[in-house]
């Protein structure tokens, strides 16, 4: 999405696919408009990925998991802490995008972001739950259960 989200925006961005760590243009002929329900302005176009693009993404995810599952818990936690910091740093922009995409008020969008941030904060501490635990109310009305088992 464009950073400004101005009402006079004339260029509609085609969203790229993230496959194997790279942003790639889709080869699809089918696109879905992301429309601001309040203004009917088309904000972006999202591709309906082709079968080969889906296969490539699945294959890349499978390869990535082979190393991710060997990543120490502390390193995983640092990645989640970085995500937490990025959400906090960019929360106003994320709220603006969410508001435009869903027609929510900024206050509603900020509330959604805060709720998501609560889940990310819980994920930051997931390493302490590796023995398997049930945690109640990690976010308003959200409980989590962790179970350590090989995949």
Regions found by a protein language model. Name each.
Residues 1-45, 78, 132-151:
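Terminal low-complexity tails and localization/encapsulation signals of metabolic enzymes
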Residues 43-130:
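Glycine-rich loop-to-alpha-helix module at the N-terminal edge of alpha/beta enzyme cores
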